[in-house]
Amino acid sequence: MKIVTINDSVSLKRDLDTGTDMQQNAVHSIIAQVREQGDQALFTLTKQFDGADLTTLRVQQAEIEAAYREMEEPVLQAIGEAIENIRDFHERQKRNSWMTTKSDGTILGQKITPLDSVGLYVPGGKAAYPSSIMMNVIPAQVAGVQNIVIVSPPQKDGSIPAGVLVTAAELGVKTILKVGGAQAIAALAYGTESVPAVDKITGPGNIYVALAKRAVFGHVDIDMIAGPSEIVVLADERANPRYIAADLLSQAEHDERASAILVTPSRALAEEVAVEVDQQLTTLPKREIAAASIRDYGAIYVTETLEEAVSVVNELAPEHLEILAEEPMSFLGKIRHAGAIFLGPYSSEPVGDYFAGPNHVLPTNGTARFSSPLNVDDFVKKSSIISYSKAALLENGAKISALARLEGLEAHARAIDIRLEDER
């Protein structure tokens, strides 16, 4: 793992993967096919891309029951407890509608309304993460969304992984559909005979899913276009190098393009961590993926001081930030840009991925400078409420008309003037 002495500013930001022309054209063609042919396109494309010859898209109750039989009790219990923790955290994010009445009788306020429907994309195969179902479904449920649809590509035998089905069932999601890729996004956006159109699409996916989400955005809402996973560890000389190496590798195994970075003022710690990473890599099942990530996107930045290390962290604006230093809570006020902040030696990043409660759908590619983790607010709309009294209009009408005429909008001004004239 390369060790770099910090001289200039650093950045995790990369060019967003907007796909090749061929990929973009393929996605637009798939979307058009789904809009024109509906379910028939989904069956055709699922056979073409996933090798599954389906006669129905909807997961049946018998399949869910079979999935439960595959699950060991300790895993089922862990899923249940994780759901509890995540729900409890997101319940604290709920907002209420409000109204206020001014002295002149004017009533102003904000009305909170949940979205009618949401579609969650769950990747298939080895990337079929039940934890992502919890993190996307629970804030939507807490927000009050009534209709939640899960789509996921089937395996060649037409099945969906047991972990996905059981987690969805534990959350009470009734509509689970066997369709993936750009065609699933198109179906959620525009609807087919079997797939209900939704108002918002969330969830991770490959480049074709990302391009499809970008293409349908505006017709429906989406969560974000997420990049590869990132972790930055801020550590002082007292930190445990074995813990740091393990946590860096926990993100590196996700993807060859994942970023794993240590920032520290301690050259000795940097060298120990580099050795530990090499040693721990040798026993990882996904060592080839992790090794490529560490080689191409991993680094250890050595700074002069801990204060300089904090500045580097804010420049990086990482998805995940671990603080392994004495009195980690004291750093919290200094961190301005990070998707999730893990404090202390026992707050390893997987604690947040699976169990603690905060959402693991986080901003990447430096976008933590201006965006937030997925949360309950992402599944509601806010409507402004205005009830102007006669007294308020008489007092302020001339000012409103003046502002309208300043902008050259005479009809706006007259809409006010006509009411003022009636009251004279």
Curated annotation (Swiss-Prot):
GO molecular function: histidinol dehydrogenase activity; NAD binding; zinc ion binding
E.C. code: 1.1.1.23
Binding-site residues, substrate: 229, 251, 254, 320, 353, 407, 412
GO biological process terms held by the UniProt record: L-histidine biosynthetic process
Pathway(s) served: Amino-acid biosynthesis; L-histidine biosynthesis; L-histidine from 5-phospho-alpha-D-ribose 1-diphosphate: step 9/9
Catalytically driven reaction(s): L-histidinol + 2 NAD(+) + H2O = L-histidine + 2 NADH + 3 H(+)
Binding positions for NAD(+) per the UniProt entry: 121, 183, 206
Active site, per annotation: 319-320
UniProt KW keywords: Amino-acid biosynthesis, Histidine biosynthesis, Metal-binding, NAD, Oxidoreductase, Zinc
Cystine pairs: none
Pfam families linked: Histidinol_dh
Cofactor binding description: Binds 1 zinc ion per subunit.
Binding-site list for Zn(2+): 251, 254, 353, 412
Enzyme class of the recorded protein, top EC level: oxidoreductase
Cofactor(s) required for function per UniProt: Zn(2+)
GO-annotated cellular components: cytosol
Protein function: Catalyzes the sequential NAD-dependent oxidations of L-histidinol to L-histidinaldehyde and then to L-histidine.
PANTHER family noted in UniProt: HISTIDINE BIOSYNTHESIS TRIFUNCTIONAL PROTEIN, HISTIDINOL DEHYDROGENASE HDH
Family to which this protein belongs: Belongs to the histidinol dehydrogenase family.
Protein name: Histidinol dehydrogenase
Organism whose genome encodes this protein: Halalkalibacterium halodurans (strain ATCC BAA-125 / DSM 18197 / FERM 7344 / JCM 9153 / C-125)
Gene: hisD
